[in-house]
Amino acid sequence: MTTLKEAVTFKDVAVVFTEEELRLLDLAQRKLYREVMLENFRNLLSVGHQSLHRDTFHFLKEEKFWMMETATQREGNLGGKIQMEMETVSESGTHEGLFSHQTWEQISSDLTRFQDSMVNSFQFSKQDDMPCQVDAGLSIIHVRQKPSEGRTCKKSFSDVSVLDLHQQLQSREKSHTCDECGKSFCYSSALRIHQRVHMGEKLYNCDVCGKEFNQSSHLQIHQRIHTGEKPFKCEQCGKGFSRRSGLYVHRKLHTGVKPHICEKCGKAFIHDSQLQEHQRIHTGEKPFKCDICCKSFRSRANLNRHSMVHMREKPFRCDTCGKSFGLKSALNSHRMVHTGEKRYKCEECGKRFIYRQDLYKHQIDHTGEKPYNCKECGKSFRWASGLSRHVRVHSGETTFKCEECGKGFYTNSQRYSHQRAHSGEKPYRCEECGKGYKRRLDLDFHQRVHRGEKPYNCKECGKSFGWASCLLNHQRIHSGEKPFKCEECGKRFTQNSQLYTHRRVHSGEKPFKCEECGKRFTQNSQLYSHRRVHTGVKPYKCEECGKGFNSKFNLDMHQRVHTGERPYNCKECGKSFSRASSILNHKRLHGDEKPFKCEECGKRFTENSQLHSHQRVHTGEKPYKCEKCGKSFRWASTHLTHQRLHSREKLLQCEDCGKSIVHSSCLKDQQRDQSGEKTSKCEDCGKRYKRRLNLDTLLSLFLNDT
């Protein structure tokens, strides 16, 4: 025979409310509370195989113990004095007295002492030597072998007597059945509370946000969201919770046990509810639907957070920036933006984040996990939202239309970001350089430039990138993959954005217009660079010669002059060029192709820029004016040469005689004089001349004679 060790006491299972909490209970809830407490006590007595004094137990069963009409009284005796403090509460014309928090603490302590005195007489069955322990919820914590097995639920117990008690609880009659859903209850009061769910009856309203509840206890718990009250503290770390259940869930974090494992991906969770919510990722199920906008969510928590979007009232305001929030927790998280606090740390790389969801997104970068696959093309995504947007690409569905230009978008956020292109709004500013962005995502990407962060490395060449998309585009250079094809001309591209921009060549669309001169461009970046022509800003400086440029592309092209790099080679003659456009124009010389024709005189040119310069001959336009003497020129090259006359600058020097010359053409003539070379040949007589000028003079004389 063994005695019960660490058996549960009545104080352990007692649900003790404070006076304020008790005042919030209505009549039906108080009756339900009474019945539950009495049943807990009966269960403990059955475990002990003894009972209290008959008068004491009947005293506990009387309703006046739980709901009194008069003021403070003293009544009853249980192994000593039990002080009963009565309180009158007026509600709807009736008086319903409530016993106080201190009263029940005293009663539960006395009942526990009485139970402790009975421990020595507790007898176990001879079935097993090891006792079991009963926790505060009257569930069984098994210690060793469990030979006795329940017939109904297959639950195992260490002792037959406890098994008998368990079977009694299992067989307890639930005589009150809901007509709507068939759910059964032991008490009629519990059934009445449950029926409010079907009727949609919500008697209790929140004064702050107007949310309605069908139970006053639910309202009380909800109000803690607005007040920030967290009465349940973790003894390990001191973290507070608004609900007792939240504390129970949190305590399992300290143990580290994750018994619930997903069969699909093997991910482990502390609670079964977390596993069920996670499994909806694989199934795609979203059972929680917003009544206002019909948007669906996987969890009720996400639905509740979404509901705040529709709430007009945002009572919690930030003192620093004035931004308002519907939840106090959201305000607390927002304050970290101002304080710079980042409480969520990545264990892989040590990076910290303000928001937990940002940490979750970041961790996927390390794991590379992409659990969401497109059935059409097999493409994988990290998030279900990414897959949802991608599916619309195959279906061609563009639900969201821009009212300005009629352009369609797959998501409302894309449309919202696009509309800023029309308004010019850039609400996201970089604190380092002051640059503005239309989207927060673009700002986050930009800030990596200041931090020098480039976490994505190419395995082929070792080059690093700040973004995964840039690495993906770069890898196509090595593989030669160009998955995006133009349906008009068949040209292929490595990026979808390049194809999108290229299509404007066929459509002639130039949506970006300069407000200064009216010139239009196919890309916003082209317009941005063009504006510097009017402002005169040249932010890109060459470190070799100090020359400034209005775009980084022009600077890169210029630097090839110093490095001598000419990566574009002509297969016909082997000549090299520093620009792709130059070799394209050069190839036309071999093919005698001159696609650009002057409408005035019919003269044709290999380059559009040549035609543009030639047309100034007909229009008389001379846009380049000398600030020194006021003389105007048709071309920038002649203007630059003319300015050397004023500055007395002679940059070109003959290597043979050391003579300094202003014009490159004069330098070439000088070098021909030194070498005796005659490169200009008359096609009629075959005579050669050192200079083109001499040949032109001869031809003019010949033409005049004829």
Swiss-Prot record:
Domain KRAB: where?
Answer: 8-78
The record's SUPFAM superfamilies line, in alphabetical order, gives: beta-beta-alpha zinc fingers, KRAB domain (Kruppel-associated box)
User: GO cellular-component terms in the record?
Assistant: nucleus
Task: Indicate where this protein is primarily found.
Answer: nucleus
MF terms in GO: DNA binding; zinc ion binding
Keyword terms of this UniProt record: DNA-binding, Isopeptide bond, Metal-binding, Nucleus, Repeat, Transcription, Transcription regulation, Ubl conjugation, Zinc, Zinc-finger
This protein's superkingdom? Answer: Eukaryota
> Where are the residues linked by the Glycyl lysine isopeptide (Lys-Gly) (interchain with G-Cter in SUMO2) cross-link?
61
Q: What residue intervals correspond to the zinc fingers (C2H2-type)?
A: 176-198, 204-226, 232-254, 260-282, 288-310, 316-338, 344-366, 372-394, 400-422, 428-450, 456-478, 484-506, 512-534, 540-562, 568-590, 596-618, 624-646, 652-674
Return the Gene3D superfamilies for the record: 6.10.140.140, Classic Zinc Finger (3.30.160.60)
What Pfam families does the annotation carry? Answer: KRAB, zf-C2H2
Query: Is the Protein transport keyword given for this protein?
Result: no
* Compartments, record wording: Nucleus
Which GO biological process annotations does it have?
Answer: regulation of transcription by RNA polymerase II
Q: Which family does it belong to?
A: Belongs to the krueppel C2H2-type zinc-finger protein family.
Give a short account of what the protein does. May be involved in transcriptional regulation.
PANTHER family found in the cross-reference section: ZINC FINGER PROTEIN (PTHR24404), ZINC FINGER PROTEIN 501 (PTHR24404:SF100)
Quote the protein name from its UniProt record: Zinc finger protein 225
Q: Which organism is it from?
A: Homo sapiens
Q: List the top taxonomic levels of the source.
A: Eukaryota, Metazoa, Chordata, Craniata, Vertebrata
Q: Which gene encodes it?
A: ZNF225
